[in-house]
Amino acid sequence: VGRVPGALAHTNVLGNALFGSISSSAIAASTAIGGVLIPQQVNEGYDRKFATAVNIASAPTGMVIPPSTAFIMYSLVAGGASISSLFLGGYLVGSLWALGIMVVAYVIAKRHNYPTVAKAKKGEVSKVLREAVPSVLLIVIIIGGILTGLFTAIEASAIAVAYSLLISMFYYKTVKINDLPKMLKEAVLMS
């Protein structure tokens, strides 16, 4: 999105959609994404009110984009409503919601001459993409497994934890064996 007017606003929308889809929390998404991108947008010359409005409007999109905890809970409470159908509907609604915000952000950014971001170098893009693939694959595994019926939503959560642990330990090397007791204790306390 680098050279598109309002590029940082579009990044905010996409970041909220992805973060929110994993966390199923608009508050967590808006805090995490907005906490990083709003100051950056202001430093780049965006109006703080515009940056905040984009963040607030886009934070809830992730709640309807699968894997959506709200849809999983609805399916359980409604007596087995099809999670696949709910997820497909969520993709459509969430994507249109995010796209709508991006169109409005584009028009406002163009009108106010908000700066674009310099085009990234080829080597930088490929490096970032290589680093992101294992994390993005988590979403594909969860959603693909549920939609194909390979596993249930509850089983998907266990698979997600195991996969996340494996890539954190062996690919990103950010978690060590010694960290596991503390992580397990925190997980128990949070649940």
PLM regions: where:
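Alpha-helical transmembrane segments of multi-pass membrane transport proteins
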Residues: 1-191
